[in-house]
């Protein structure tokens, strides 16, 4: 049985990603793996100075949102890291996966309210599937 040592979750603060978060936590605990949770900030902020007030404020908002919404779910699991930065989400996830030699990337599938039984993958997900340096798991909502 293959075990995973480094797992990345491409995370967006949405209901679609909640299922992926739960699966990522489950797999990380089961495999005693490191869990990297990455949230891409608005790509239009790429290249801004790290001292830019808009960027600082956005990073603080993401950290606070993580602390209140996500950290309580993984508080007892010490092997996690959360990161966010302005980036193209798909390319950044693939870069991180390559850099840390990830064993698995998890993605949540988007749901369409008018088609409740249909899950779909958007451009970000398709790009990750095409460029990922490791296996990718799609998690339905």
Describe the function of each predicted region.
Residues 2, 73-105:
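Structural beta-alpha unit
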Residues 2-51:
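Small/aliphatic-rich secondary-structure junction motif
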Residues 22-25, 50-53, 97-98, 119-123:
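Short, glycine/charged-enriched secondary-structure capping and boundary segments
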Residues 25, 71, 94, 126:
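Active-site phosphate/pyrophosphate- and oxyanion-stabilizing loops and adjacent acidic/basic residues
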Residues 28, 74, 97, 128-129:
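A generic structural signal for well-ordered alpha-helical segments
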Residues 36-38, 81-85, 137:
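General small-molecule cofactor/ligand-binding pocket signal
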Residues 54-65:
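A short acidic, glycine-rich active-site loop
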Residues 98-141:
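Gly/Ser-rich helix-loop-strand patches that form or flank binding pockets
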């Amino acid at each position: 049985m293959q075990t995973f040592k480094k797992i990345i979750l491409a995370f967006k603060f949405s209901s679609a990603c909640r299922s992926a978060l739960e699966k990522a936590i489950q797999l990380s605990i089961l495999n005693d793996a490191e869990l990297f949770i990455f949230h891409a900030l608005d790509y239009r902020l790429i290249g801004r100075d790290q001292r830019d007030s808009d960027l600082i404020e956005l990073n603080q908002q993401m950290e606070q949102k993580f602390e209140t919404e996500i950290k309580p779910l993984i508080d007892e699991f010490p092997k996690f890291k959360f990161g966010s930065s302005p980036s193209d989400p798909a390319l950044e996830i693939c870069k991180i996966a390559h850099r840390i030699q990830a064993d698995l990337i998890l993605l949540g599938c988007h749901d369409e309210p008018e088609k409740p039984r249909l899950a779909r993958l958007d451009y970000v997900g398709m790009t990750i599937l095409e460029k990922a340096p490791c296996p990718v798991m799609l998690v339905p909502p």
